Regions:
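Cytosol/matrix-facing amphipathic helices and coiled-coil assembly/linker segments
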Residues: 1-18, 67-149
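The feature identifies polytopic integral membrane transport proteins across all domains of life
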Residues: 8-19, 41-49, 109, 141-146, ...
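Generic transmembrane alpha-helix signature in multi-pass membrane proteins
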Residues: 15, 25-37, 158-163, 189-191
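C-terminal ends of transmembrane helices
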Residues: 61-68, 134-135, 187-197
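Structural signature of hydrophobic alpha-helical transmembrane segments
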Residues: 169-181
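Interfacial loop-to-transmembrane junctions
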Residues: 185-212
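Juxtamembrane boundary at the C-terminal end of a transmembrane helix
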Residues: 215-226
Length: 226
């Protein structure tokens, strides 16, 4: 595990590595496909940028909609639980006791735990036991959607900038190599965040990227208008 400042950075960056990888793969696939089709530089650059913008907006919109729905669902569950605690506290205590019995506690201990947790914070105890949610920790749709969009855009910029900045015929090959290195890096970061052996995720991500770019490049060749 990483510690200190590096650990804090990794804690923030780590969860968004998959979105960065998505951005790299999506942008690279679009750029390599148009490069395979032999289009001019201006068309390739515009198509890559349009794909990057569309992908960024789509990722953010999907994440926002998903978390917004999750937040609304959790809010409804908390309201329902609060009403039940006010109108039928004994039944709710019995229900909480049975939940802990089903998880392996003896009936006596389960009852004691249920009583103590209810006395401390009844709503939190029941919400966490019954629904796996916390009243004080709710999803933040806008913040998380922006983070997902930023990660996707950051990843997607790399292959697009490679296509923009590298002149002439080598651009597709050089972009291919740059993307493989970037995906290997995201695979390594994911492995480090999970305390896994680093080689397999690196090879897997690079292999997926190579296959995706090869397929889109060949598809571009096959649909070449000329």
């Amino acid at each position: 595990m990483v510690n200190g400042a590096a650990g804090r950075i990794a804690e923030w960056v780590g969860p968004h590595v998959p979105e960065a990888s998505d951005g790299i793969l999506t942008s690279a696939g679009i750029c390599e496909g148009f490069a395979g089709a032999g289009v001019g530089s201006s068309v390739l650059i515009f198509a890559g940028f349009a794909g990057l913008v569309a992908g960024t907006l789509a990722m953010g919109a999907v994440e926002y909609s998903k978390l917004r729905a999750e937040r609304e669902l959790q809010a409804g569950q908390l309201i329902r639980e609060r009403v039940l605690l006010e109108t039928a506290p004994d039944a709710e205590l019995d229900e909480l006791t049975q939940l802990y019995v089903s998880r392996g506690l003896s009936p006596g201990l389960a009852r004691q735990v249920a009583i103590e947790l209810t006395a401390h914070d009844a709503l939190a105890a029941h919400a966490e036991a019954e629904y796996g949610i916390s009243p004080v920790s709710q999803p933040e749709p806008l913040r998380d959607a922006l983070a997902v969009s930023a990660a996707f855009a950051a990843g997607g910029l790399l292959p697009w900038l490679a296509m923009v900045l590298i002149p002439g015929s080598p651009r597709a090959a050089v972009t291919f190599v740059i993307v493989l290195l970037a995906l290997a890096l995201t695979g390594w970061v994911s492995a480090r965040m999970s305390d896994l052996h680093s080689v397999r995720p690196v090879v897997r991500m690079a292999g997926i990227g190579a296959l995706a770019m090869a397929i889109t490049y060949i598809a571009g060749i096959l649909i070449h208008p000329g």
